[in-house]
Amino acid sequence: FEVHTDLDFNETTGVLEIKPSGIVMEYSDFELEGSLDTKNNMDLDLSIKGTKPNFDMFIAFAPANLIPVLERYKNAGKIYFNANINGPSNKGNVPLIDVHFGASKAFLENTAKAKRIDEMGFKGHFTNGHKRRMSTMEFSLSNITAKLEEGSFLGSMMIKNFEEPEVDMKLDADFDLDFIVKFLNLKNVDNTSGNISL
């Protein structure tokens, strides 16, 4: 984890300006810029952006025990992540968090089994909402697409209110069961055949 930054602190106004900076993580790089108002409730105005030609950006946020599993798959695509953090951040205040992320023209390939998912894409969004608490959090994935060896997958998902989750999911999928078993390296599944349509 490395941070390359240029900071400018104005003692009169109490504003710390973060000039365009780089955050280097093991699997991804991000750009950070914005300001922190130290005299006004530690008011944040931050922008974090990242683009990558593969899924490493999402692997960077995965739980440590899941990373070796994800690393088994060859992958590429146009991946982006844009986050804005705005508002007071001290004395019990939580800033507004608004994140947009997604992928297009992507693929995942299990090279050991020669199984590949093509034409993957999705648009994602997360916010902690106007009240900046669990009850106003929203997470969505829209325009989820994927072309399987034999079949396809289309879908969307919306989760509202993380205290009492309301989930709205739509799927239109048609795929070969044996393909999924091989692609995911499922070991304890035998004699799989047939199609699944949702």
Language-model region placement:
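Extended amphipathic, helix-rich lipid-handling scaffolds
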Residues: F1-E17, S21-M25, N41-E109, M120-S152, ...
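Extended intrinsically disordered, low-complexity coil regions enriched in Ser, Thr, Gly, Ala
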Residues: A114-D118
